[in-house]
Amino acid sequence: MNLPETAKLQEIYGETEISGARFKNLADNFSKIYGQDKAEYFTAPGRTEIIGNHTDHNGGKVIAGSINLDTIGAAYPNGTQVIRITSEGYRDEIVVDLTKLSKSNYKKGTAALVAGMMEGAQKNGFETGGFDAYVSTNVIAAAGVSSSASFEMLICTIIDYFFNESKMSFNDYAKVGQYAENVYWDKASGMMDQMACAVGGPVLFDFADRDNLKYSKLDFSFGKFGYRLVIVNTGKGHADLSQEYSEIPGEMKAVAKVLGVELLHETNVDALLEHCNKIEDDRAVLRALHFFGETSRVEDAADAIHHNDYDKFLELIDESGKSSWELLQNCYTMKDFHEQKITRTLALTQLFLKKIGAGVCRVHGGGFAGVIAAIVPEKEQDNYVEYISRFVGKENVYPMDIRAIGAVHIG
């Protein structure tokens, strides 16, 4: 069985031993399950949202980056109209018949996601076809680093390479993933997760024009100014929070409607203040205030990166985290307000950061559950990992690097 070239693995992962073993395992299982003697290999990373919390779905701006955890796949066309995917660690095979795509046939789970993506690809003018795949991931599931978007971008890369001559853009990838989540999962997600996983590296995104998303890569790494990103899984997963996620864009769009526009990026905070007393939903007002402040902070953060002003950059991330906690209110769910794993872990982290006099922390990604992000001095990384592990377990603490390469066909 063919395997990816070591030079390509070195380029993506910065090493070949661990990654080589992962792809060897992938190849062996793919051959064993599907009887194939050749394969093509693909990778799509998870993502970290650095600043721009819950702004993408209302046309705002985000700085995000792909991370050094990824979903990998061995795949090959099977000459039919049936997609068959085996995911490492899961007993049931994912089977999707391309001749029977409908939400009534695929109602839940990963099969629904794949079916939705195929329908989304077709509706956007792209070809689909049957293939077999064996996939494996080390992206933390249901924790806010976009395990689902990583999987989606892997599948997009597969169908792009096999059936579309690699002509799909990252924007196309994101639309396909968003369609599947919106229509088949009833989740009102934006496109940030998909774009960050697809593009790779640290990136500034502008979501004002959904059909022509603008993005620019940033010359940035936390190590460049002596810090390290640590993702902490707080102990409660994202699996049952679709309503909470959907309420945020819904409430923001309701405010936008009062202001005479469709999305908040089309208006400004002055218009909100002028109409504030007409809006009965106080939380919606607070969330709109977060949007305007957060979009401005993203612009300032990009400027700080450009001028190597990392003190200002960290200050803006700190402000962003406070706004998410106080205005956006996505650190815990009102359905179970006694369980506050996010706020608990933030508070414990703040005690550590105050003691050392450096670093910031914030809720990470969609929120309500899952992970927080702590940005700590490199010299304090081990101390922080040891400290926070007392409360969440060392297996839930992940020092991260930003990976330069996004969703790609490896060879």
Please provide the spans of the model-predicted regions:
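Alpha/beta catalytic cores of group-transfer enzymes, especially the acyltransferase/condensing modules
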Residues: E165-L213, S320, L346-I356, C361-H364
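DPxDG-like acidic metal-binding loop motif
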Residues: S66-I67, V145-E165, A373-V376
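Phosphate-handling active-site elements
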Residues: K123-D132, I159-Y173, E378-F391
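Structural signature of FAD isoalloxazine-binding scaffolds in flavoprotein oxidoreductases
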Residues: K61-G79, V199
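Beta-strand segments within the central parallel beta-sheet cores of soluble alpha/beta enzyme folds
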Residues: R84-T86, G130-T137, K167-E181, L314-E319, ...
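C-terminal nucleotide
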Residues: M1-R47, I72, Y76-K107, L204-R362, ...
